[in-house]
């Protein structure tokens, strides 16, 4: 089986459907004997340029190991699902399990906010 990186962008009005979509897509990969190595829901983000007069979209990143038949099925599903604005499937040489730069940057910012909050509590005492 080959390794793939899949990114798809969902219409912002359909954000509540994203968890169901993720479950459906990962389920089809696992049913075919594949594995999901990385799954990141980046949430709503600003688009670089408008798509269908929209300026935001809900982003999802998946790194999977799956047979070609499942990938073809996913691409067809993306193509005919009106909620999916754009999708990209890339073949990779090996499994990617570490956090993406988007996720790593988000995690680096969280502790900074907690540190500032702790400094504020110390100043009150």
From Swiss-Prot:
Listed under GO biological process in this entry are: translation
In this chain, composition skew of type Acidic residues spans 116-125
After translation, the protein is modified as follows: Modified post-translationally by the addition of C-terminal Glu residues by the RIMK enzyme.
UniProt-annotated stretches for the region Disordered: 96-125
Q: Which residues form a coiled coil?
A: none
Secretion signal, residue range per the UniProt entry? none
Q: Which GO terms describe its cellular component?
A: cytosolic small ribosomal subunit
Which keywords does this chain's UniProt record carry? Answer: Ribonucleoprotein, Ribosomal protein, RNA-binding, rRNA-binding
Gene3D superfamilies recorded for this chain? 3.30.70.60
Q: Where is the composition biased (Basic and acidic residues)?
A: 104-113
Q: Which GO terms describe its molecular function?
A: small ribosomal subunit rRNA binding; structural constituent of ribosome
Question: What does the UniProt function comment say about this protein?
Answer: Binds together with bS18 to 16S ribosomal RNA.
Question: What family is reported?
Answer: Belongs to the bacterial ribosomal protein bS6 family.
The molecule here is called: Small ribosomal subunit protein bS6
What gene name does this entry carry?
A: rpsF
């Amino acid at each position: 089986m080959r390794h793939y990186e899949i990114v798809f962008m969902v219409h912002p009005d359909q954000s509540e459907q994203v968890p169901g979509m993720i479950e459906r897509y990962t389920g089809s990969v696992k049913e075919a004997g594949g594995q999901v190595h990385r799954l990141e829901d980046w949430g709503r983000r600003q688009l670089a340029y408008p798509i269908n007069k929209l300026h935001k979209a809900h982003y999802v990143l998946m790194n999977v190991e799956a047979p070609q038949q499942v990938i073809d099925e996913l691409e067809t599903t993306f193509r005919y699902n009106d909620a999916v604005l754009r999708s990209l499937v890339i073949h990779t040489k090996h499994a990617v399990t570490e956090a993406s730069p988007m996720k790593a940057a988000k995690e680096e910012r969280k502790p900074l906010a907690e540190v500032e909050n702790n400094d504020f509590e110390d100043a009150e005492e």
